[in-house]
Amino acid sequence: MCIRDRAHHLLNTRQVAFIYHVKADPAAPVQSIATVSETADDVLSGAGSRYGPVAPLTGLLAALDRDAPFAVVGKPCDLSAIHNMAKHDNRINKLITHRLAMVCGGQSTAQKSREILHNAAIQEHTVTLYRHRGYGLSLIHI
């Protein structure tokens, strides 16, 4: 079962109230942001590999403040950081009932994505969708 399917299952069986993960930034699709998905459709719209820098735990405290069980999807280093945070915040082990890790090949830089755009003669501000995997590298721009 892939991570997306596992997240759908957790939501559909009401084991969690939401999934905390990253997705493409709607305002800048080459970049990524942390997000909360409450439905399978939300998870699907945010699914897909994201390469480049992202601060995946920026909204974690707000997610914990919702006081509802949830799952986190992240890189192993993100989940390790959450494990370490649990030593200082007992809500983590109570509320984060599932931690889903993906295989990580290491951190990439945003410069790699910009180089791809440059080589394709596409200006970043014209990009409306940027996918790294799942459909091959997909760029949609205006």
Roles of regions detected by a PLM:
Residues M1-H141:
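Iron-sulfur-associated redox domains of electron-transfer enzymes in respiratory
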